[in-house]
């Protein structure tokens, strides 16, 4: 079985990473690509569903999972905890499915230490002004929260140079095409292709 690839995707809030990942998944078979569903202690937003967008749990339950070493990574962001189940990720990758992790730079650093083979992608907005406009356009946060998110955005973007790939989400379709290109190139990597075409290569090299 060909091991799936773990993709780390990070961006400041409002840069469009979640929309890009969801658009990508609509074009990929479920047996090829899945998105990781994280655990979080933050409140559920309108339109979100338990187990689909996040596993919403109490802070007490989250801390218990930390004590049990059940997370591949976890971090505290905007006064809430977020974490990724180690077991789910490892089992999914072992089945040959690529997994996307929508996490911040703190989680990305933890993942890279534990899974050096993971590929990382950072998504930038075209400008601070556009980022602020997008945050206001969501209609989910107060001005105080938006201001806090803008401050956090700068702190997040400082870490762009820790990632393998960089995408600027100015035009959505162009950014999506860039994301497709990254996935396609990784699937054409020699190691994965050699596993996929092992029988063919053996025949070609046979005396």
From Swiss-Prot:
It is found in: Cytoplasm. GO terms for cellular component: cytosol. It catalyses: GMP + ATP = GDP + ADP. GO terms for molecular function: ATP binding; guanylate kinase activity. Its EC number is 2.7.4.8. Residues 4-184 form the Guanylate kinase-like domain. SMART domains: GuKc. The keyword Ribonucleoprotein does not apply. Keywords: ATP-binding, Cytoplasm, Kinase, Nucleotide-binding, Transferase. ATP binds at residues 11-18. The keyword Acyltransferase does not apply. Belongs to the guanylate kinase family. Essential for recycling GMP and indirectly, cGMP. This is Guanylate kinase.
